[in-house]
């Protein structure tokens, strides 16, 4: 700490000295500049502008010489106005008057006597002032040189000041660093010395304690030995007395435990017997209940199996009946579809004939012939479409029936329902025969219905063909025209084609629905025969030609 205070005091003293020196130098420079400006200012202002500028330029370009190194005070004492031409002429003219010599006024006395002396003095002074060119240049460029010197001195002063401040800061930092290092070293040294002292003190204390403990251990050993001898004697006597007491207590305890064990064993046996009896009675009851429940379950299971078999048989019978009905419905649908197409074709032919009647007479025969061909084509197309549709529906119905039959029937036997409520097992042969008989009976019944419907359709077709032609003839007669009657084969060609088509449709429907059967075949032929007779009768009645074609 003392070293830091000393270094701070030295730094403060040095800084004060430097500041005083820096303050004194500018003051002196400013004093000389003011004096020179006051003395040389009027002379420079009296010069013409061109000469003054040329003089300053020449002084700025001229190199420094040895005479420039003289002081500012010596240059200030030289009267510069003596070099001006106007002043020289005025001095030559007025030798006897008062003249300015520098800063003093001089008065010449004696007139011509002193003329030579005055002129000689003036020449000498002129030579001194205007003697050599470098004096004039030095006197003219004094201000420029002064400014340069002043700037140079200022720069040097600033540089010295900057260097001085940097050195001061550097020395200060070094001193602080050295002080910190010395302080750290002293602190470390103190810590090491303190640690060594503490360790030595601890070792000494530990050694003293060990010596004291050894002495105490020796005394304690002696005391313990004495106490052990005394305690051994007391312990032996106490042990003998305690052993006798423990033996007496053990005897009493053994007797008590034996009595308690006997009583506990007797109670346990009686409780176990009573618990076994109590447990056996509910167990027997539970076993009896379980047996009864098992018996009931067995009976219920048998009854349930019989009922399930009965239900399965009923379901199978219902499915078979449904399939048969579906097959019959498919036959009905095909017959209805074929009949509808035939009726539509017949109506179209009748409409064509009716339109042809209303046309002019020369075209009547041609239109009738074309209508016959058109009706034949429509009838044939209707019959072919009905056959394909009926065949496809038959195959689909048969496949569905076979699939459901295979899924519902068991292998080799089937349970059929009976009036007694118990299922009856039938062999597969008898089952098939019975099903075939029932199927044949139902199909025959349905086939008769289908053929009856076909017969009615044939009658409707005949009526539909006759009515349009009668209406056409009636309209022609009302208008006073000529009725047209088909000739030869054309007269019955339309009705023949329709009759043949209907017969084929009926036969195909019968084969698809009920199969080949003699009784059904006879019934169908009978119905078709009656239909043919009725159709022929209608044809002859409707197309009976009048005696006179032209009315």
Curated annotation (Swiss-Prot):
Skewed-composition ranges (Polar residues): 223-242, 250-265
Expression sites (tissue/organ): Expressed in dry mature seeds.
Positions with biased composition (Low complexity): 206-219
Regions that span the bilayer: none
Keywords assigned: Biotin, Coiled coil, Germination
Induction comment from the UniProt entry of this chain: Induced by abscisic acid.
GO cellular component, one term: cytosol
Keyword flag ATP-binding: no
Source superkingdom: Eukaryota
Modified positions (N6-biotinyllysine) in chain numbering: 103
Signal sequence coordinates: none
Biological processes, Gene Ontology terms: cold acclimation
Record region (Disordered): 1-29, 197-265, 518-551
Biased composition (Basic and acidic residues): 1-20, 533-544
Residues in coiled coil: 141-211
Keyword set includes Lipoprotein: no
Function statement: May serve as a biotin source for several growth-limiting enzymes that are necessary during seed development and the subsequent germination stages, and thus may play some roles in determining seed germination capacity.
UniProt record similarity statement: Belongs to the seed biotin-containing protein SBP65 family.
Name of the protein described by the UniProt record: Seed biotin-containing protein SBP65
């Amino acid at each position: 700490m003392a070293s830091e205070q000393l270094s701070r005091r030295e730094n403060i003293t040095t800084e004060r000295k430097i500041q005083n020196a820096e303050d004194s130098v500018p003051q002196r420079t400013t004093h000389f500049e003011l004096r020179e400006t006051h003395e040389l200012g009027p002379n420079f202002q009296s010069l013409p502008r061109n000469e003054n500028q040329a003089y300053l330029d020449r002084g700025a370009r001229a190199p420094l010489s040895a005479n420039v190194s003289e002081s500012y005070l010596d240059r200030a004492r030289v009267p510069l106005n003596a070099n001006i031409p106007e002043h020289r002429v005025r001095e030559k003219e007025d030798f006897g008057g008062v003249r300015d010599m520098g800063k003093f006024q001089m008065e010449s006395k004696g007139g011509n006597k002193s003329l030579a002396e005055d002129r000689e003095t003036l020449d000498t002074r002129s030579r001194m002032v205007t003697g050599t060119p470098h004096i004039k240049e030095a006197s003219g460029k004094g201000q420029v040189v002064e400014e340069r010197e002043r700037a140079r001195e200022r720069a040097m002063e600033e540089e010295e000041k900057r260097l001085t401040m940097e050195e001061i800061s550097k020395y200060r930092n070094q001193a602080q660093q050295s002080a910190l290092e010395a302080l750290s070293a002293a602190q470390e040294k103190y810590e090491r010395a303190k640690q060594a002292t503490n360790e030595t003190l601890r070792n000494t204390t530990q050694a003293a304690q060990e010596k004291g403990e050894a002495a105490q251990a020796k005394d304690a050993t002696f005391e313990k030995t004495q106490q052990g001898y005394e305690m051994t004697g007391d312990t032996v006597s106490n042990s003998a007395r305690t052993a006798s007491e423990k033996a007496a207590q053990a005897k009493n305890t053994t007797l008590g435990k034996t009595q308690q064990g006997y009583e506990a064993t007797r109670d346990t046996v009686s409780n176990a017997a009573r618990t076994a009896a109590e447990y056996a009675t509910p167990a027997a009851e539970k076993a009896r209940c379980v047996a009864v429940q098992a018996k009931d379950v067995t009976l219920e299971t048998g009854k349930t199996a019989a009922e399930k078999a009965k239900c399965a048989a009923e379901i199978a019978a219902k499915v078979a009946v449904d399939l048969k009905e579906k097959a019959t419905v498919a036959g009905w649908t095909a017959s209805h579809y074929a009949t509808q197409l035939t009726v539509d074709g017949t109506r179209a032919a009748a409409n064509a004939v009716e339109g042809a009647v209303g046309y002019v007479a020369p075209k009547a025969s041609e239109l009738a012939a074309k209508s016959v061909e058109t009706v034949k084509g429509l009838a044939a197309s209707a019959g072919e479409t009905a056959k394909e549709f009926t065949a496809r529906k038959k195959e689909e119905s048969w496949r569905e029936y076979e699939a459901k039959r295979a899924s519902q029937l068991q292998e080799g036997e089937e349970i059929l329902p009976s009036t007694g409520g118990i299922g009856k097992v039938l062999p597969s042969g008898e089952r098939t025969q019975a099903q075939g008989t029932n199927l044949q009976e139902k199909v025959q019944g349905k086939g008769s219905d289908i053929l009856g419907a076909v017969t009615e359709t044939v009658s409707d077709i005949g009526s539909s063909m006759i009515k349009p032609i009668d209406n056409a003839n009636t309209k022609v007669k009302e208008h006073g025209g000529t009725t047209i009657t088909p000739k030869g084969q054309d007269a019955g060609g339309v009705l023949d084609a329709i009759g043949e088509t209907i017969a084929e449709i009926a036969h195909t429907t019968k084969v698809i629905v009920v199969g080949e059967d003699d009784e059904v075949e006879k019934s169908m032929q009978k119905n078709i025969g009656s239909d043919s007779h009725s159709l022929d009768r209608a044809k002859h009645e409707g197309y009976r030609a009048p005696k006179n074609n032209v009315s």
